[in-house]
Structure formats: C-alpha cells, structure tokens
C-alpha cells in the first residue's frame, strides 16, 4: 500500500503487530481504547490506567512516534487530559502526545500535536481540508471514510458488490486529500480513514462498515489503486485501473467517459483489440502535489464485441509494464492464492487463502457470484465460511488455513465452483523450531 504511517485506532495493538512495524520501518501512532464517551471519575481513572499500561508496554518499540492520550473524538476535558498527558510524559518524554479532535480549535487543548478528523466538502463537492492552526504541529488524523462529499452524512458504502460509480470515487477522494495535504508545508501529515472494512452497527451494511480501501479479508479494492501507485517505478512499476473492464448490466458502456488509471509511469498507451485508443499523461494540473497523479481517459466503449483492453506503460520510449483485460466472461477462472507456502504446526500459525473470480489475464471480474466449496487433506483445518458465497463480497473471499498442533506434512486444499471448476493449492506444515 506504500504507506509510511499507521494509526492504531482506537486501542493498543498486539505486540506482534508492533514488532512487524519495527521490522518494516512503518511509523505508528498508538492510542488508548475508546470513542467519544469519557464517562465519570471512575471511568476516567481507567482511561488514565490505560495510558500508563500502553506506554509501559510499548515504549521500547522504535516504530512508535505518537502516543494517543485522548479518547478518540471526545470533547475537551482539561482535567482528564492534563492527567493523561502527564502520565505519558512521566513514562516516556521522548515522544509527543496527541489525540483526534472534531473541533478545529486549540481552546482547552493540551496535547503536543493537534490532530483533526476532517470531514467536510470543498465548494465544488470535492474533499475539503481545514486550514492549519497557528503555532502548533497540525495533523489530519482522519479524512474520506464514508463521508458523502457534496452531500451530507456518512453514507458512502464502498462495497465491492455495491454501486460501481461509488466505488470509483473512493480512490479519487483519497488522491484529493493527499494532494491537498501536500500543498501546505504547515500540515504535518495526513492519515485517511481507513485501511480495512470492519464490523460495526453504525452506518453499516449487514453488520460491516465499508470505508476501507481493502476489504475485511485485507484484499485491496478499487479505492486502494491510488495508494498502490505511490511508489518509485524503479522499485515496482504499477498500472492500476480504477475500474472493472466489464460490460454487464451495471456498466453497459464499460468504465465510461471519466475513467481513471493510477500509475507511476510517465506515459500510458491504451489499446482496444490491438488498435490504439488513447495516449495518456498524468493529470498534474488537477493533482499538482502528488508525485504520481492519476490518468484520465474516455472509455465509453461498445461492449458487444467483448473487446480486450491492453494498457502499456512507458518511461521515455521504453516499455516498462503491460497489463491486459478481457471483457469475455467465457474464459473466466477461479484463482487461489496463499500468503505462505509453509506454516508451523504450533497450534496458532495460519496463512490466508484468497479465492477470486478473474478474467483470462488475472484481472478481477465484477459481480462474480456462486459458491466456493473447500475441502482439505492433511494436517490442517479451515478457519472461515465454507462453503463461501461470493455474491455478497463481489467475487472475492478468503479463509485461513491453520496447521494442526504438532503435526507435519503436506496440506492440500481444493476449491470447487459450480461453473468455474476446481483449483488446488498446497501448503507445507512444519514442526516448530526448537
């Protein structure tokens, strides 16, 4: 995802996660548990206890750069937050304190870094950012989320199985907030909300909230296409369409006139059925502060011939990367991918198995349905829904494969789909190292 900081909202994380951040060099904002409510004296004593326990446990993790000592989005309470700040400083005075605010004011504010959850529209309905406050480090702790830019409330549910036009807006909103955050050196940084879908009863669909640029299985959605392109092409060239190449009922004319492609390459050439359709350059006029702005193209296309799309990416005159997409579902297939080819049989080690419906080139197929039925042979167990219904998750799903404690050997997992046939993947379970 090419991010350099993560906000652990709104509770301290497992130490294994912080260990991984230390190893990866991923900066961490860690904060105490809670959301808005700050209760009475006894409740506040518990919040103070949480600050002390968090700092004591995690202060030796070099990845941590901010202690969140406020209850997320809570009203100011100088008496409480003076105590929590002093508690953190007494245990670790090397790091600043902060906590997300919904008030754009330093009245009765006590922390070191002003962190603002900014959900408002600019006059044109795009992402708005409040001006920095003078005299204090100013940080955006949240933006985008499910906020309805150009409207009211938090109603944008970026479901992979939902409205396609809305899905396509998510990446643009994230691009806008980072472009505008980079426009003023007085902004210390931007953390957009959020990385992953999560369970919730507020603003949710079937018990899941959908502000994540990846789904609950950690599989990137269209919204992640902006982030995936923000990397030096010498490290990893990227071409990520912010659309599905599909001509079904939801998108009969294909991606449409305002189609977006995120890439870190200098020039894109689009071929439809081997005919040159467009030559594109990044839109630096609309996104002047992004290192790798998006590309825009008219892709309102007659889909009756089930055309193929090829996107060639260039640096100068050198072809760096080419990606192809098929509109013909007859060649679709079921894809299985595991994160790890080997796991330890220590009773807890597991790996993710992702299954998805893709076209013949491996691109995701919009609104693919049907059930995936899994079977397993060997010293392992399936953790998750089986069979798995793909329709509700937009043709993508996942389970976890855990090795049985103390057992070693080859684990074979077979996935069966009524129209796409079966696929097989293997994992090796090894006994733990002594």
Show where each model-derived region lies:
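Low-complexity "stalk/linker" and mucin-like segments enriched in Ser/Thr/Pro/Ala/Gly
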Residues: 285-290, 378-396
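Extracellular Ig-like/FN3 beta-sandwich strand-entry sites
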Residues: 304-308, 348-350, 406-410
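Catalytic cores of secreted or luminal carbohydrate-active enzymes
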Residues: 192, 197-199, 204-254, 258-335, ...
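Short, solvent-exposed loop/linker segments at the N-terminal edge
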Residues: 248-254, 343-351
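Short, hydrophobic beta-strand segments
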Residues: 295-303, 388, 393-406
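Short, well-ordered beta-strand segments
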Residues: 275-279, 367-379, 387, 425-427
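Substrate-binding/catalytic cleft of secreted carbohydrate-active enzymes
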Residues: 5-252, 257, 283
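Beta-strand-rich structural segments
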Residues: 257-263, 337, 348-366, 372, ...
